[in-house]
């Protein structure tokens, strides 16, 4: 038998969702400032949602010269606790630990990865370990965890790499459909901090435009929050 109180709570929750979504006009184009304000006012979840961006690019990633990929250091961070693994030779393990790495080792970490144990968000490696790491490339690659010199995760500068990963470094990569998706901070951040992150990310993606690309590069852009509304950005408002 249904509890009347439970039914009332469900109806109340549904009403809140409807009211929140009604605050966002689906046919309206927003600039970044107004978009952030609208998403905050339309959020109804009880946890701290992530501000997410989706960018549709006029590229074909199947062509090697149209790959768009890189990393961005977000000025205000991501709001997430990032677990960092460092794979290096024994003589550099203490340096990695002192720099704040959560997991440090060499072949022992590689063996854990082979067994399916992956308890880190970022994997950093020194160049002399890459041959050994190649044995788990098929595991780490699809998860976006394979160390890559272009992303700063294959490096001799362990300390700085850990600092970047911990402070809010976000990787982006265009999917087969030409779409880039990333989380750029928590909705509880100040509007100013969210806008700093947004501008830094958008600027980086625009700078990554393939030199030989013909036609329009940035096709569409949307902002949303976790389990929340989505708004379309007016591309003419992007400097």
Curated annotation (Swiss-Prot):
GO terms for biological process: regulation of translation; translation. Pfam families: Ribosomal_L1. One of its GO terms (molecular function) is structural constituent of ribosome. One of its GO terms (cellular component) is large ribosomal subunit. Keywords: Repressor, Ribonucleoprotein, Ribosomal protein, RNA-binding, rRNA-binding, Translation regulation, tRNA-binding. Belongs to the universal ribosomal protein uL1 family. Part of the 50S ribosomal subunit. Binds directly to 23S rRNA. The L1 stalk is quite mobile in the ribosome, and is involved in E site tRNA release. Protein L1 is also a translational repressor protein, it controls the translation of the L11 operon by binding to its mRNA. This is Large ribosomal subunit protein uL1. It comes from Rickettsia akari (strain Hartford).
């Amino acid at each position: 038998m249904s509890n009347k109180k439970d039914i009332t709570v469900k109806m109340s929750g549904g009403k809140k969702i409807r009211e929140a979504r009604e605050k966002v006009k689906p046919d309206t184009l927003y600039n970044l400032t107004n978009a952030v304000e609208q998403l905050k006012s339309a959020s109804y979840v009880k946890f701290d949602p992530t501000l997410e961006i989706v960018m549709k690019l006029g590229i074909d990633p199947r062509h090697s010269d149209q790959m768009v990929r890189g990393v961005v250091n977000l000025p205000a961070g991501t709001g997430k606790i990032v677990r960092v693994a460092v794979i290096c030779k024994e003589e550099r393990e203490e340096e990695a630990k002192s720099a704040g790495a959560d997991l440090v080792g060499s072949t022992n970490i590689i063996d854990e990865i082979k067994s399916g144990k992956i308890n880190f968000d970022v994997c950093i490696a020194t160049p002399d370990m890459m041959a050994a790491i190649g044995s788990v490339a098929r595991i780490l690659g699809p998860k976006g965890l394979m160390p890559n010199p272009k992303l700063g995760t294959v490096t001799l500068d362990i300390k700085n790499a850990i600092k970047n990963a911990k402070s809010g470094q976000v990787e982006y990569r265009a999917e087969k459909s030409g779409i880039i998706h990333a989380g750029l901070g928590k909705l509880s951040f100040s509007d100013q901090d969210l806008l700093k992150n947004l501008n830094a990310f958008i600027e980086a993606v625009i700078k990554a435009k393939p030199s030989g690309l013909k036609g329009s590069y940035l096709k569409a852009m949307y902002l949303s929050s976790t389990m929340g509304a989505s708004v379309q950005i007016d591309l003419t408002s992007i400097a």
